[in-house]
């Protein structure tokens, strides 16, 4: 942004427990201080602070309470050094539906935007008033017969319980 002559608008991600990117708590002081310094220099504007739930599709999972607490702590740390992000957000589809305390300034619906329930065992798409937004179609590019006990795909996430015919469609993770 600086070399291009523009002020970068950034949102800072903190790790609250998903452990998939974001500044870990041990680095917050340095992370927020650097962001504040760059903002004071006019290089960036910190527009948001965010994180992501690991277990929101299981509303009673204890990690949800812990992650929300850690996120609130991160907000306090950022504000204590003078950062005032306009948007603070952690809620995915499941937290949007089942954890109103985590709505903060905005929510980030993902799977529910497509009309799917984040956890059909709790509530179906229909129960939630969601309508599927698309239909996915693909061509079968290979089919094979497998014996009982054959592992399929990375990590053998599916193991045949009896002789089974499987088909490959060229889409998604590892074309499975």
Region roles according to the model:
Residues 1-7, 164, 176:
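Short intrinsically disordered, low-complexity coil segments enriched in acidic
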Residues 2-9, 16-147:
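Active-site loop/helix belt of alpha/beta enzymes
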Residues 133-176:
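Functionally critical, mid-to-C-terminal surface segments that flank or help form catalytic/ligand
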């Amino acid at each position: 942004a600086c070399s291009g002559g523009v002020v970068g608008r950034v949102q800072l991600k903190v790790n609250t427990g998903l452990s998939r990117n974001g500044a870990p708590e041990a680095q917050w002081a340095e992370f927020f201080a650097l962001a504040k310094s760059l903002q004071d220099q006019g290089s960036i504007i910190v527009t948001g602070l965010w994180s992501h739930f690991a277990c929101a599709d299981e509303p009673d999972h204890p990690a949800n309470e812990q992650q929300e607490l850690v996120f609130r702590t991160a907000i306090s740390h950022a504000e204590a050094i003078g950062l005032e992000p306009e948007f603070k957000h952690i809620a995915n589809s499941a937290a949007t539906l089942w954890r109103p305390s985590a709505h903060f300034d905005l929510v980030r619906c993902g799977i529910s935007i497509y009309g799917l329930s984040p956890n059909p065992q709790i509530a179906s798409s229909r129960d939630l008033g969601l309508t599927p937004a698309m239909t996915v179609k693909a061509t079968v590019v290979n089919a094979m017969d497998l014996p009982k006990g054959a592992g399929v795909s990375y990590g053998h996430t599916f193991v045949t319980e009896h002789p089974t015919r499987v088909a490959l469609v060229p889409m998604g993770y590892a074309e499975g």
